[in-house]
Amino acid sequence: MHGKTGILISVCGMAAASLVAATGAVPYTWKNVQIVGGGFVDGIVFHPAAKGVRYARTDIGGAYRWNEQAERWEPLLDWLPYEDTNLMGVESIAVDPSDPDRVYLACGMYTNARTPDGAILLSRDRGKTFRRVNVPIKFGGNENGRGNGERLAVDPNDGRVLFLGTRHAGLWRSADRGLTWNRVDSFTETREDYPPGPPWDGPSGIVFVVFDPRSGAKGAPSPVIYVGASYMHRDNLFRSADGGLTWKAVPGQPAEYRPNRAKLASDGTLYISYGSNPGPAQMLNGGVWKLDTNSGRWSDITPDKPTAAKPFGYAAVSVDARNPQALIASSFGRPGNAGGEDLFRSIDGGQTWKPVFGGGGTFDFSLAPYVSHTPIHWLFDVEIDPFDSGHAMFTTGYGGYETFNLTDVDAGKTTRWRVMSTGIEETVALELLSPPKGAHLLTAIGDYGGFVHWDLDKPAPVGNYDHPHFGNTNGIACAGNAPATIVRVGIASGGHHGNIGYSLDGGKSWQPTATTPQPGSRLGDIAVSADGATWVWTPEGSAVSVTRDRGATWTEARGIPRGTRVIADRVNPRRFYAMALFDGKLFLSDDSAASFAEHALNLPDGLPRPGGSRGDTRGGQDRIYATPGKEGDLWLAAFNGLYHSNDTGKTFVRMDSVTELHGFGFGKAAPGAGVPALYMIGIVDGQRGIFRSDDAARTWVRINDDQHQWGLVLHVSGDPKRYGRVYVGTHGRGILYGDPARK
């Protein structure tokens, strides 16, 4: 079975756009709003023979290459369009040990029936350009076991040969540097009876492929290959001695756990980390074992044994390329203070261990201050630099850390760790707010709350979204005429309380409300009246509730269904709007949201039908937006089109050039224009992109280019303080800001 080769795609860094579009184009420069990390970095791959060459993969945010000169990670997959969002989940990375310029990516986010097949991306120039090879395989870059690996490997003796382990499709081989692939039918151990469940707790299939370079000679395929499969209570490590033609289970193996990661030392010792679950679903047991591949002898070298009272497993293990006895291993799910996780260090092949963090490790959070709120977790890859025994890295759910004095552990000294994620931006934007005055931007993101960005090029200082501190922030709004009043809603992170917070000084300080509509009110949407006096919160699955005393008391709004998103008029402090798009209803309040009157929603081409694909539900489509500075002026941004009303929603006019929409927002008017600039994500005149209009949607210009697409984009907002500036909120590539390129 052969893959289909694709086109050659150029991958560039932050560069001015060169654009061609039917509606016109304006070159923009793009940069990330600096958060640093913000998502799961689930794998790091060092090139074994080229100093400074290393790559990182993420579960939903693509892959990165380390830039040694700039001392930052650079994204490699920003060219992926919306249609290929699935490929932003990188299941595995492989480098060619004999050619430092070649790198391979196995891409695909989910294995469910709704998700398209994945692809192998091949590069001969360290990821500057890629060739795409479609394969009949689904990858699970954002599924359980995504931190295992590496599933993809290049034969160190013959770079033409690659092996690929998959979750549900068995073992595959390529003999032409990844251009075509054939299933290895002799490897029959490909299935497991695993209880059905969500993707974050499912089977992982084959989790690593390891070649033994000592078994062959340069220029010919290596005979000995090891494959680990995430099975439990049965054989899960297999060996081939004939280049993959036949396979046998390795005798004596510890089958009571699942293998997670493996490293082959220079002396032929195979080190494997084990757990009762692939992770990051919870592990209840596990260990670290080594196999002397010369003698076939197994040894249990677990640093800290799990118990019934202290259940956990082991995520990863790594060995020093310069010293086959020097190891580090990482725990997963280990209970204790600050999350309980630890690294363990051995310099005698695992006979004895020292805890690295418990032994006095210190951490510098200054490159990403927000991580000081979050325990170290999800250490699913640990690596020792093959050119520097003191330099080690480990990954986390928000990026990772590195040290340059790992060997000090051996002398009983303290290690110093710092954030290593500069350049990696993996947050998911749930809302964007650029107020008329004050901070450039306030972000609402998944998992790590969000930030007030006074400086777009520096990470926000610690604590700027505290009191309360959220995990997810789902809604944020400010008063149109009093923008220092800002309210945000979400769900409190562990150890914190309160699911709604407000600021009266533009985000410099925050406090929770005294009460909430119901004891469990959380998430949902928030609206703030133009004067800041009335707040309307629709908590998740709940009634629309109103407060006029900053949350001291709440009342239920009348005349509007539960769960309906409400927005405020940007001029009239008593007016609010809401919509039930598929029911053809518009709701209007002129009494500060005490009650809503229902009106027919009259669209010139009829109502859209529910169901089918209408984009990501967290995006900015299928919403109404109130125009800044114009009372009663509304834009209806449906997934299938854009509509405008200047009479409080009595009538709407369709903007015919827009045929698909994922996000919508306003920015400062162009010089001499009497209307705010409009920004949208979607399709205009058949061209997909991010667009700006300076004339109320009569004409549009594309402002991104094919090198800057970022897969799925959820939200867009202009800046009311600076014409042309736009903020783009992605699904896994962070938040970006763009400005017109200087001529």
Segments (PLM) and residue ranges:
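Extracellular glycan-interacting surfaces
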Residues: V11, A21-K743
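Bacterial N-terminal signal peptides that target proteins for export
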Residues: M1-C12
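Hydrophobic alpha-helical membrane-insertion segments, chiefly the h-region
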Residues: A16-V20
